[in-house]
Amino acid sequence: MKVLVITALCFILLQNVLGEDTYEDLQNYIENLINENQDEARECVPLENDCTKLKYSNPCCKDEKKKYQYKCSCIVDKTEQCTCQRKETVEKMMKGMKYIKNLGKKIG
């Protein structure tokens, strides 16, 4: 979720550079990502807090009920404490980051 918030803040800076239509498309894309992930927040105890060791591997969390598959999601700062989220959530965030990176290449 931190990544989405930081990304959203970056869009404010991009607004002046981008045309209105492009900015609105980008804003809608991020809002859709956030809305899709709202119901996925769950308490999860990391097995380790070393994200450089885990490298988004499964399993990074204890899930007694074996209900979900998890991935480490320290994608902003490798030294940040490891948080674990559902695999689907992490993959959606990575897809969003890739979209933004490609958009940056088109602009620059």
From Swiss-Prot:
The keyword Phosphoprotein does not apply. Its main location: secreted. GO terms for molecular function: toxin activity. The modification Isoleucine amide is found at I107. Disulfide bonds join C44-C61, C51-C72, C60-C84, C74-C82. One of its GO terms (cellular component) is extracellular region. Contains 4 disulfide bonds. Cleavage of the propeptide depends on the processing quadruplet motif (XXXR, with at least one of X being E). It comes from the Eukaryota. A motif (Processing quadruplet motif) lies at residues 39-42. Expressed by the venom gland. It is found in: Secreted. The keyword Coiled coil does not apply. Keywords: Amidation, Disulfide bond, Knottin, Secreted, Signal, Toxin. Residues 1-19 form the signal peptide. Residues 20-42 form a propeptide. Belongs to the neurotoxin 19 (CSTX) family. 11 (latartoxin) subfamily. Insect toxin. The presence of a 'disulfide through disulfide knot' structurally defines this protein as a knottin. This is Latartoxin-2c. It comes from Lachesana tarabaevi (Spider).
